[in-house]
Amino acid sequence: MDLKTSALSRLEGQLRACFFSDSTLADFSDDAYFWSGQNIRGKICLDLGSAYGLSEDALLDIAASTQLLHDASLIHDDLIDEDTERRGCLAIWKKYGKAKALLIGDLLISKAYQIVIQSKVSAATKVVWTSEISAAVSSAVSGAVAELEFDTHNQQLILENYYRMASRKTGALFALPARCIALTADQPGDVDRLNTIFLNLAVAYQIKDDQSDFLGTKSGRQHSSDLKNGRPNLYHIFVNNGMSAEKYFDYIDDYQASLVADSIQLADSLPKQVYVILKELLIPLIELKPLQSSNRLLQVGT
């Protein structure tokens, strides 16, 4: 077992201990919903944190708290959108009911703070982490509200408003561990660049998610769920504006590619491991299907 695998195993153990130690969460400790993800945040924390020289214990605390926040956001998202599956498992609301799903999501947020409180880092670092978590949660809620109220009428502002919405809703929590790591390592000059990188990649991932919804290839989600639920989806927006498939596929692809290119450029001025994380871990997750391979699905999507 290599060092990263060992650390990821420790992370899962820490998360399971968090579940077992709470009488309410203990009932969910064996639910695959919480243990079947790709552990992206844990991998980011370990890879990025090692580049900044942080201890494994501190990195695992950052990873555990941000993973709990991520799980809470997924539970709430599934509930709001009424998506029935996640990670190949029944959504929490579908399996246990909407009221319990709401409460479990809230409880996970509180547990994220508890991990910070119980961490062995300095009191000053705990204050920093707590502040960052509070800001990220507030931003995620703001983005979720913006998603519900998204205005598609002003075509010139579609991409600007979409970026603002997705960078808050998805990006704030995604950038959280990187921000905590740089601040803990006393590298405040890197925070803004890391923040922009992870916001960009989160928006790029949201575009990938939009395409999956549009093409009907996402497990557990009704086909064109975004359209039925009134959620902003770039593909549906541009279809409704009368764009040809070739034009809107190219337009969206170019926009996503610009986000990735900007992130890679910013990574050049940061520790080399940031570039490795982008190229080997994150960019493969956001690759869009080209128009040529999507033609069979477009009749359904439109």
What spans do the regions from the language model cover?
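All-alpha prenyltransferase/terpene-synthase fold signal
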Residues: M1-T302
